[in-house]
Amino acid sequence: MAHRSVIPFGPQHPVLPEPLHLDLVIEDDRVIEAIPQIGFVHRGLEKLTEKRDMHQFGYIAERICGICAVGHSCGYASACERMLDIEVPGRVQYIRTILHELSRIHSHLLWLGLLADAFGFEALFYRSWTLREQILKIFESTCGGRVILSINEIGGLKHDIEDSELAGIVQTLDAMRPDYEALVHTFLDDDSCGERLHGVGVISKKDALELSMVGPFGRASVVDYDVRMFGDGAYADLAAFEPIVATDGDCYARCQVRCAEVMQAMDIIKELVGKIPHDGIGGRTKLTPADGARGEVVIEQPRGEAYYYVRGNGTKNLDRFRVRTPTSQNLAGLTHALQGVLIANVPMIILTIDPCISCTER
């Protein structure tokens, strides 16, 4: 029997900016088992619901994660609106969806840059983050913040985004698209990238379903599930699109899905801007949920399905706030993908899965 040893990976590693720790059990340079450990940045945000009223907690919910801030803000507000039986105007739904899709573009461009940097592909890293900067400028010009937008509130929006600004968003995305398509062509068709990604970290559709994998991680293994199409968080009635899937289930397939989702998000935004209604943006309302009233919603974050649950207690504070983030769902798939791979491929596999520990540890 070959000698086995345990090598620690993280929580601080030059390839992975996330504080994820893995104990890698290796045998002859191959990973036999990966044991995850998290909890290094736990902040107890859900507990703060007992000390902040519902309006105040909206600012905290948005800070669960910087990359997914818009999605967390939309998820929290939507769950509270379900609990309070508040129906927001159509314009609010459209603007939230537009900002959420911009956040998806931002997240995937950030991820692509980090992956390129791990390859040593510095030119691609710079090009990817140069395009990402355009999205951050859109956020800043329309909402005032580059990361934390603070535009959502329970019952609507704090301020409107004018039609001229929305048209400017479309113009920016149209100008970005040729550069982005050239960037993706460079990355996906590069032989050195293909050699590092093809056939690495393969997960079959059967395993993906059994492990309840979500988001691009699952769709790269032919799991045709996207919350934007199904369930409470769907907005397929607002725009025409289909879930993007790949068939190989390896690192390359996960890259294909995310790269295609950026262009899909651009198309969704363009369609929404072209038919956005003008029925107002709602506004702040008095928040007095009945004791025991509940609200829940699922939305498709850049990394997959996120679930939000709120429960009232008859006061202005929530009795309970709960989030289940996509990385929580995907940790089992991550450890499965690492089994049997060369230890040199571990960073690539983790990066293509794109875990977000800030979301997971709240």
What are these regions (language model features)?
Residues 1-362:
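Active-site bordering "gate/hinge" segments
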